[in-house]
């Protein structure tokens, strides 16, 4: 029984270290989302902070379309970050059993 608890504690420590490393990597990550065939691009960090917005001047005359494309590009970048986060956090816990219903990232 004591061996199981010690092993569990070691696994928890390793998982915590792996999760911290994955979070640090995600914080450095930059992802670009696009919309309108590349007419709008939005670059976000892994923490979903906006770093850059690029808009093709040809769409600026249609405000509603520009707004829609900016939102779509932002959502594209956000979805890419979510997927990358899920992948990296999943790798950080590889081989470790999480309780049912527990999801990552926390």
UniProtKB/Swiss-Prot annotation:
Main location: cytoplasm
Subcellular location field: Cytoplasm, Nucleoid
S-adenosyl-L-methionine found in the keyword field: no
Cysteine pairings via disulfide bonds: none
Pfam families linked to this entry: YbaB_DNA_bd (PF02575)
Segments of skewed composition (Basic and acidic residues): 80-89
Role description: Binds to DNA and alters its conformation. May be involved in regulation of gene expression, nucleoid organization and DNA protection.
Family under the similarity heading: Belongs to the YbaB/EbfC family.
Name under which the protein is recorded: Nucleoid-associated protein XAC1110
Species of provenance: Xanthomonas axonopodis pv. citri (strain 306)
């Amino acid at each position: 029984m004591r061996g199981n608890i010690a092993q569990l504690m070691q696994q928890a420590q390793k998982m915590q270290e792996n999760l911290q490393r994955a979070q640090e990597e995600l914080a450095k990550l930059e992802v670009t989302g696009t919309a309108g065939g590349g007419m709008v691009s939005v670059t976000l960090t892994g923490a979903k902070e906006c770093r850059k917005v690029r808009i093709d001047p040809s769409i600026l005359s249609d405000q509603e379309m520009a707004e829609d494309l900016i939102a779509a590009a932002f959502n594209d970048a956000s979805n890419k970050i979510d997927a990358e986060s899920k992948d990296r956090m999943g790798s950080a816990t590889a081989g470790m059993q999480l309780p049912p219903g527990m999801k990552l990232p926390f």
